[in-house]
Amino acid sequence: MATPHINAKDGAFAETVLMPGDPLRAKYIAETYLENAELVTDVRNMFGYTGFYKGQRVSVMGHGMGIPSCSIYTKELITEYGVKNIIRIGSCGAVRPDVKVRDVIIGMGACTDSKVNRMRFKDHDFAAIADFGLLRKAVTAAETLGIPVKVGNLFSADLFYSPDPQMFDVMEKFGILGVEMEAAGIYGVAAEYGANALAICTVSDHIKTGEQTSADERQNTFDDMMKIALDSVLLK
């Protein structure tokens, strides 16, 4: 049923939804990769589409920026539309010297400075991890496509403009592969409501070196990440 944030009809979404932060990236994926793609929701211009990829029904929808925004959309997709699998496909920043701009990262887990998972988990630490089945399929798809990936921890930050830049040194020490703003929240929502989740991110900028991609490139390219996510949906 429709919600305050999603105006799709019952059954409008496939069991698996790919979720970029940017709704225009969702539009790009639908127009570039999906056959018979249909716009199923557009509340607040947070576009969602359902179509077919190599014969497999799949949906793609934006989730906005930050854990509060993505938590709303993922929760409603799971509880109101019966979505089983959420695959975030987004951008992240790198802090380690061995992680380069445009590298693809698969988030095995996600640390965070947000308190939302503690609120969900009765003020205890919750290990926000990806579903192993989705993770394994993504790695297999990447290997089949010949696309190198890095698998490990992400850090989901509440603030884009950090007041504590020294924290990036701590992240580097602890082996964090990428800094973004949603994965830990999505993993928490999926765990709470019995769904599966995975985050695949492309490095859009390097926090230490200052190298970065353009806004247009972030919106309309990063195709390796998209191909991995889409091909992983085909695997059993």
From Swiss-Prot:
Catalytic residues identified in the record: 205 (proton donor)
Pfam families in UniProt: PNP_UDP_1
GO CC entries: cytosol
Catalytic reaction equation(s): a purine D-ribonucleoside + phosphate = a purine nucleobase + alpha-D-ribose 1-phosphate; a purine 2'-deoxy-D-ribonucleoside + phosphate = a purine nucleobase + 2-deoxy-alpha-D-ribose 1-phosphate
InterPro entries per UniProt: DeoD-type (IPR004402), Nucleoside_phosphorylase_CS (IPR018016), Nucleoside_phosphorylase_d (IPR000845), Nucleoside_phosphorylase_sf (IPR035994)
Amino acids binding phosphate: 21, 25, 44, 88-91
Keyword Nucleotidyltransferase attributed: no
EC number: 2.4.2.1
Keywords (A to Z) from UniProt: Glycosyltransferase, Transferase
GO annotation (BP), single: purine nucleoside catabolic process
Binding site for a purine D-ribonucleoside: 5, 180-182, 204-205
Domain of life: Bacteria
Record-annotated site: Important for catalytic activity: 218
Top class in the EC scheme: transferase
Keyword Zinc in annotation: no
GO function terms (MF aspect): purine-nucleoside phosphorylase activity
Family to which this protein belongs: Belongs to the PNP/UDP phosphorylase family.
HAMAP family per the UniProt record, alphabetical: Pur_nucleosid_phosp
Subunit note: Homohexamer; trimer of homodimers.
Role noted for this protein: Catalyzes the reversible phosphorolytic breakdown of the N-glycosidic bond in the beta-(deoxy)ribonucleoside molecules, with the formation of the corresponding free purine bases and pentose-1-phosphate.
Record-given protein name: Purine nucleoside phosphorylase DeoD-type
Organism: Tolumonas auensis (strain DSM 9187 / NBRC 110442 / TA 4)
Lineage start: Bacteria, Pseudomonadati, Pseudomonadota, Gammaproteobacteria, Aeromonadales
